[in-house]
Amino acid sequence: MSKGPAVGIDLGTTYSCVGVFQHGKVEIIANDQGNRTTPSYVAFTDTERLIGDAAKNQVAMNPTNTVFDAKRLIGRRFDDHVVQSDMNDWPFNVINDNTRPKVQVEYKGETKSFYPEEVSSMVLTKMKEIAEAYLGKTVNNAVITVPAYFNDSQRQATKDAGTISGLNVLRIINEPTAAAIAYGLDKKVGSERNVLIFDLGGGTFDVSILTIEDGIFEVKSTAGDTHLGGEDFDNRMVNHFIAEFKRKYKKDISDNKRAVRRLRSACERAKRTLSSSTQASIEIDSLYEGVDFYTSITRARFEELNADLFRGTLDPVEKSLRDAKMDKGQIHDIVLVGGSTRIPKIQKLLQDFFNGKELNKSINPDEAVAYGAAVQAAILSGDKSENVQDLLLLDVTPLSLGIETAGGVMTVLIKRNTTIPTKQTQTFTTYSDNQPGVLNQVYEVGAMTKDNNLLGKFELTGIPPALWCPQIEVTFDIDANGIMNVSAVDKSTGKENKITITNDKGRLSKEDIERMVQEAEKYKAEDDVQRDKVSAKNGLESYAFNMKSTVEDEKLAGKISDEDKQKILDKCNEVISWLDKNQTAERDEYVHQQKELEKVCNPIITKLYQSAGGMPGGCQRECQEVSLELVVLLAVALLDQPLKKLIKHSMTSPSKIFTKKTLFKCNMQSIKSVMRLNQFPFITIT
C-alpha cells in the first residue's frame, strides 16, 4: 500500500475514535461495524485475540480475559491508591511486576501478562487498521490525545504505546485543546472569544479555558481529574443494584464476575436511557443462581447516587477560572465534550454555575477530540489547506515542576499553565566543599505536598573537588508533547555533564519497547492467520448451504435432473458434516474442501445457465429471454452470503423477464467488481 496521510486518534478510556484531514475537511472514520467510535477493549480467547466491538460483545462470556480501562493503568505504579481501588471493580487480574502493573490473562491455553502500554498499543493498532481500510493506504504518522491533566509518566507511556503499535507519534496533545480546535474551525471564530471546554468522558475529566482569535488557540489554564467519568457513574449504579439484589433475594453476586459484568452492561444502557427518559428498566434473565432480575431506576435516584461526583465537576471549573484570572462572566462559550456531558444533571449544574448561560452543544461530543487531533496531524505533516494553514496552537503544562534540594526544600522551576514548549534554567550548587556529586529529586507539584508526584532523581557525578561550591546549571525542557527532559552543565569546568535519570515511575526502557514492537508484530501476524482461517471457513460454509438451498428450491423443479440434484446434495451434506467435525481446521483444509465442492457443483451450474439463457455464441444471444428469478437463484448459489443483499437490491421484481443483454448490462455489470463473476467462465457480460 502507498503511504497515507497522518491521522488523529482519540485514545479513550472506554471508546476510541480516529479521524483524517483530507480534501480540506476532517472525516471521522467508521470501523468495520459501521460505528464511528470503537470500544477500547482487548479480549483473549483459546483461539484468537479480539479488539474493539468484537471484544466488548463477548465480555460477559469471558470477563477475566477481556481487558479494558488500560488508560486508568497507564503510567501509574501498582501501589497507586487509584489502581488498588480500580482493581476491586475489574474482572481481570492485575499483578505487580517490580512496582509496575501488568494485566494477566489466559491466551491460547497459556498465561500471559501485558503492560498497560501494550494493551493500549493493541487498541491503537486497531484504530490504525480502521484508518488504513478506509484510506486504502498505509498509515504511519499520528497525533494521539491524552487528558490535559495527564502527568509526565502517563504522557510518555501513551507515546510508547503509539511506538509499539507501529505509529510515529507526531505529537501528544491535550483532549480539551483538540476539542477546542474542532469548535473553533466549526464556528469559524474570528474576533477574540474566551471558550471553556468541559470534557467529561468515560474515565477522565478536563476543563480548559482558551482564547481563540483568528486561528490562534491559546490555552489560558487547565484543570481536571484523571479518574472521573462515566464508568464511575456506572459503578455507583452497579453497587446500588448489587445491594438491592442482596436485599431482595439474600444472595451476594459481587464475587461472581460474569453476573457483575452482565449487570454492569445493563447499568451502562440504563444510564444512557436516563439522559433522554426519566426512568429506565433493568431486565436480566437468570442473573445469578437462576434468579431473573427485573428492576428499574429513576433519573432522580441515579442523580442522588452520583450527587457528590456530579457536584465535584464544578471544582476544576472554578480552579481553571482562577488560574486564567477570569470571572465567569468573561466566558463567551461553554463547550460540552465527552459522552458523559449528555447527563442532564451535569448540564444543569454547569448552566446554573454560569448563571443560566446557554451551553454550546454544536460539536459531536464523541468525535470532537479526534476531529481536532486530525487537524493537528495535518498541520504537523505539512498540509497547506486554507482552513488550517494559519492555525496556531499554544498549549500549557498542567502541573508545576520543581526540585527538592537539600533539607527537603521544594524549588518550583516551571509553574503550571506555562505555555509549552518551554525551557527554564536554574543554577544549583553543592551544599559542602569537595562534594563529588549532587542528587536532586524532580517532582510534579500537586495542590498539596502529599500530592507531589516524584518523576525521578538525577545525579550529577564527577564534580572535581573544590573548596568553593561549584555552580551547576540545570535546564528543564518541556517539549510540545508535555514531556520533560533534563540536562545540566558544570559551570566551573564549562563542560556538560551527563545526568542519569532513575525513574521511580518505571518507564519502559528502549529494549522493552523494541521487544514489545516485535511481539505486537507477532500477535498481528497470528491475528491475520486466524482471520484468513475464519474467512475460509465462513466462505465454505456459506457456499455449501447456499448451493444446497438453491438446488432444493422448488423454482428449479424440472430444470435440474434428479441425478445432478442428488450429486450436489450429497457433496454439500458431506462438506457440512466435515465442517461440524473440523471446527478448528487450518485455512488450507477449508480451501481444499471448497475446491472439491466446486468441482462437483460448477459443471452442473454451467449446464443450468446454458439451458436458461443460452451461452454466448448461440443464435440471437442478444435477444434471448432469461428468467430473472432463475439467474438470481444461481448467482446467489455462487456468491458469498453478504452479496445476496447486493443482488436483491440491484435487481427489480423477480416476476419480470429481461433479455440477457439488459439483465447483464444493467445489473451484473454494476456489481461485477464486487462479485468477481469473471472467475466463472460460463458467465459473460455482453
From Swiss-Prot:
Keyword Nucleotide-binding on entry: yes
GO cellular component: cytoplasm; cytosol; nucleus; plasma membrane
Gene3D superfamilies noted in UniProt: 1.20.1270.10, 3.30.30.30, 3.30.420.40, Actin, Chain A, domain 4, Substrate Binding Domain Of DNAk, Chain A, domain 1
Sorted UniProt keywords: ATP-binding, Nucleotide-binding, Stress response
Record region (Substrate-binding domain (SBD)): 394-507
Gene Ontology molecular function, alphabetical: ATP binding; ATP hydrolysis activity; ATP-dependent protein folding chaperone; heat shock protein binding; protein folding chaperone
Record region (Nucleotide-binding domain (NBD)): 2-386
An individual GO BP term: chaperone cofactor-dependent protein refolding
CDD domains: ASKHA_NBD_HSP70_HSPA1 (cd10233)
Free-text function comment from the UniProt entry: Molecular chaperone implicated in a wide variety of cellular processes, including protection of the proteome from stress, folding and transport of newly synthesized polypeptides, activation of proteolysis of misfolded proteins and the formation and dissociation of protein complexes. Plays a pivotal role in the protein quality control system, ensuring the correct folding of proteins, the re-folding of misfolded proteins and controlling the targeting of proteins for subsequent degradation. This is achieved through cycles of ATP binding, ATP hydrolysis and ADP release, mediated by co-chaperones.
Family to which the UniProt record says this protein belongs: Belongs to the heat shock protein 70 family.
Domain commentary: The N-terminal nucleotide binding domain (NBD) (also known as the ATPase domain) is responsible for binding and hydrolyzing ATP. The C-terminal substrate-binding domain (SBD) (also known as peptide-binding domain) binds to the client/substrate proteins. The two domains are allosterically coupled so that, when ATP is bound to the NBD, the SBD binds relatively weakly to clients. When ADP is bound in the NBD, a conformational change enhances the affinity of the SBD for client proteins.
Name of this protein: Heat shock cognate 71 kDa protein
Source organism of this protein record: Oryzias latipes (Japanese rice fish)
